[in-house]
């Protein structure tokens, strides 16, 4: 009988989470709309470290900036493996985790694009004058300023809202 409900233990939904992932469109939207990521690296003695960092999407690549007095710079020079976790703005239950490696480079054009992106964020999309862009670049342009870009090797996602919805409704998302 097709009306027979499958009885599963209470913990089943939270153990079998494969249906609670995000599609490519949602992933792209989250990465484009978010402004910050929790970024991770490891210390010399392999201890994990994370920090929330502002990023800009430049030519489709997640881009950050930092100076050589920051731990992440030294960590990623030593071991470029990184993990970035990005949550949907206003909804931490929908998240994208990106694993890959970080390229570190001196690149004035990339710094300019990063600065322009930051100013567009601050102005909420209103045009920014060339003088203001130059002023912003000067704030970033320390002699030891580097640009960092994530080369994505693996993408993991989770949609906690959908999981909660399935728990509440009892919908069977495993035997479709």
Label the model's feature ranges.
Residues 23-26, 49-51, 69-71, 134-136:
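A generic local structural motif
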Residues 28-29, 74, 138-140:
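Short secondary-structure boundary/capping segments
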Residues 67-70, 79-85, 123-136:
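Short acidic (Asp/Glu) patches
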Residues 70-72, 91, 164-165:
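Short, surface-exposed beta-strand-loop junctions and turns on beta-sheet-rich folds
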Residues 34-68, 76, 82-88, 95-98:
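Short beta-strand segments
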Residues 13-37:
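Short, basic/aromatic recognition patches
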């Amino acid at each position: 009988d097709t009306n027979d409900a499958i009885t599963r233990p209470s913990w089943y939904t939270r153990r079998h989470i494969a249906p609670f992932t995000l599609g490519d469109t949602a992933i792209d939207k989250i990465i484009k709309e978010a402004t910050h990521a929790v970024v991770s690296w490891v210390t010399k003695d392999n201890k994990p470290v994370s920090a929330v960092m502002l990023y800009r999407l430049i030519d489709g690549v997640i881009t950050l900036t930092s100076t050589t007095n920051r731990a992440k710079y030294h960590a990623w020079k030593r071991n470029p493996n990184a993990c970035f976790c990005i949550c949907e703005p206003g909804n931490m239950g929908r998240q994208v985790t990106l694993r890959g490696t970080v390229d570190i480079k001196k690149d004035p054009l990339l710094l300019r694009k990063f600065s322009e992106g930051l100013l567009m964020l601050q102005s909420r999309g209103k045009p920014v004058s060339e003088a203001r862009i130059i002023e912003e670049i000067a704030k970033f342009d320390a002699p030891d300023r580097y640009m960092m870009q994530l080369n994505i090797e693996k993408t993991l996602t989770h949609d906690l809202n959908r999981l909660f919805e399935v728990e509440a409704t009892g919908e069977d998302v495993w035997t479709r």
